């Protein structure tokens, strides 16, 4: 074992006893590079009782878990999936995979359901292809972490431009930057 790790010669002689970060760190195992596999480290170093950080004194799971969720105070938490009994408040958005694809619409203030539309009827409602691939559109699409997705490749046409051509309406802009400038100027002048 001193000269091989996982069947590869000479790997065992490099980096021995060097502290390392491993995917198993979250379960309380102190794995170092000299450990052969993850289950070797978990065999004797399992977290079985919670401890207070810094003091290294034992505590109850209730106290440990309440400390874990403390950063969630004054945060907006939403859940997509089956409703569960959590110790903090959250908005249940549903458990359908379709709901997950509507995150951006919810970020923009879209209210799901027919009643919300009846109370405040929109002048124009256009969600055509809301589930479509984001690589063919020039807009602000977000992923599950809220980061902006990729821009369209090459000569791909934007949906607003294609829709105006089909409707036979000439618009005073040709690019997304011109659209943003037009609406920013219009909203500032109001």
Swiss-Prot record:
What the entry lists under InterPro entries is as follows:
Mopterin_OxRdtase_4Fe-4S_dom, Prok_molybdopt-oxidoreductase
Molecular functions (GO terms): 2 iron, 2 sulfur cluster binding; 4 iron, 4 sulfur cluster binding; metal ion binding; NADH dehydrogenase (ubiquinone) activity
Q: Where in the cell is it found?
A: Mitochondrion inner membrane
| Required cofactor names | [2Fe-2S] cluster; [4Fe-4S] cluster
Q: Does the keyword RNA-binding apply?
A: no
Q: Which reaction does it catalyse?
A: a ubiquinone + NADH + 5 H(+)(in) = a ubiquinol + NAD(+) + 4 H(+)(out)
List membrane-spanning regions.
Answer: none
Keywords, in A-Z order = 2Fe-2S, 4Fe-4S, Electron transport, Iron, Iron-sulfur, Membrane, Metal-binding, Mitochondrion, Mitochondrion inner membrane, NAD, Oxidoreductase, Respiratory chain, Translocase, Transport, Ubiquinone
Q: Which GO terms describe its cellular component?
A: mitochondrial inner membrane; mitochondrion
E.C. designation(s): 7.1.1.2
Q: Which Pfam families match?
A: Fer4_NDSU1
Example GO biological process: mitochondrial respiratory chain complex I assembly
Assembly mode: Core subunit of respiratory chain NADH dehydrogenase (Complex I) which is composed of 45 different subunits. This is the largest subunit of complex I and it is a component of the iron-sulfur (IP) fragment of the enzyme. Complex I associates with ubiquinol-cytochrome reductase complex (Complex III) to form supercomplexes. Interacts with MDM2 and AKAP1.
According to its UniProt entry, the function of this protein is described as: Core subunit of the mitochondrial membrane respiratory chain NADH dehydrogenase (Complex I) which catalyzes electron transfer from NADH through the respiratory chain, using ubiquinone as an electron acceptor. Essential for catalysing the entry and efficient transfer of electrons within complex I. Plays a key role in the assembly and stability of complex I and participates in the association of complex I with ubiquinol-cytochrome reductase complex (Complex III) to form supercomplexes.
Q: Belongs to which family? A: Belongs to the complex I 75 kDa subunit family.
| Protein name (database record) | NADH-ubiquinone oxidoreductase 75 kDa subunit, mitochondrial
Species source reads: Mesocricetus auratus (Golden hamster)
